[in-house]
Amino acid sequence: MTPKRWMLLTIAAACAALPAFGAANDTVTVTVTGELRQPVHFGIDAERLWFFWPERREQLAEMAVGRLKVDFARVAINGAYEREEGVTNISAYSDVIIPMMKTFRKYNPNLRFFASPRPMKEVYNSKTDAKWLADNFRNGNIGMAAYPLWVGGHKRVVKRVYKKVDKDKWARYLADYLNLMGREGLDVAYLDLMNEDQSMWGGDIENVLYVIDRIPTLLDRSVTMPKIVFPSTWSPGDGLKKFLNVPSVAARRGEVLKRIGVVATHNTPDANRNKFDEAGLVAFADAVRAVDPDKELWNTEMHGWVGTRSPSDDILNSIILWRHLAAGFSGIDTWLFFGPWKGAAHPMVYSNRGHGPEMTAKYEIFKSVVNDTCGGRYVASASSDKRIVPAVLMKERRMLVSALNTGDGEIAVRVRLPEGMHVSGRVERRLWEASKDDISPRISHLECGVQDWTSIVPARSLVHFALTVEK
């Protein structure tokens, strides 16, 4: 018997006699297979800055990308910069967006920026611009159009001249943005062409491919072409209906996907765990993977798992994140990061001007995942009971095993590592217990390295096991 084998057997024998974290009659086994799947990248969403206060810029940036070791931050391409063709307004970027981006880089020099066109309805004032909107748009509603009217391609416009997209203007608009950021010393790693509304390209993929090819020819010499993100549809169902199954794409899916850096969708209709269309999510992911198993697949605006004033909701709604990872999504942009104390329950951090920021349980759960494994890989796992929803991520030797108890009673969760893998050092246990109404986890430790361990997970609660492994 080798010394290493003898040591492992000795450790296992010693630890077998240790008590589990509590005791329960109901035991569920989570088996970690060791099969490495897609790389995982996590980002925060700063596309909407309604509650990013300049006087709190340092504090909010540190919370967003300093404490959180995210890969990327989603930022806005602001239509207010050139609402009318040829008339630019630098304050659309210089007032808040550029200072925020530079402060982000201060706290995370390796942060990558993901630029996304912000809906144009935010550029117009419903009162002072009422006549202009009424003259140009049905019912005066610009909808979710992501580009200025002069670029064309808007489905709600009344005037025919704007109905067809001008591909060269579209490419120029995006290149101008990238060049402006470059002059400010800000490189953009990912560029989204859409933001839910797909009317710009009119179902003709040649429009999109033309723009992808045209942008690099318009960039300053010092500016690098970002990865293209497309189509960021309203829902995974739209990803099939309005992208993959569109006639101009359906017959040449492989060719089209090669030209796109990241295939993306939103899941806007999924308000919470009870309205989550998991089947639609899986169908879209499977369709992409069937064409290109290694294609980067992102949710560029993940809804449903939102920061609330109720930690128990944050805990249970986290199932939406775990299901995305299980479906094969490699990039998650959580929408939104900054928000108000009162109002839509989207934010990860509530940042009311007078009261200062307040973190949510979602923030703490996300931090637990991101800071241990962002940039790592998703690892296949299986649960012996559907009440326990597992997710396993690994970065180098660091592993995070997540187990969500969706049931109404406590469950003893036994985690089994694959053959030949064992724990080095202690297992850190982070528990978010719904009944405690606390955003922060209770932390305890398993003192001994073993190949499997058991822990009690209370009803409707979430546990993360953070550990270092050896093979």
Residue ranges and their predicted role:
Residues 23-55:
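N-terminal module-boundary/linker segments of secreted carbohydrate-active enzymes
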Residues 40-46, 69-77, 112-116, 189-193, ...:
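Structural recognition of the beta-strand scaffold that forms the well-ordered cores
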Residues 383-422, 460, 464:
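Carbohydrate-binding surface patches
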Residues 65-253:
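Substrate-binding cleft and catalytic face of glycoside hydrolase catalytic domains
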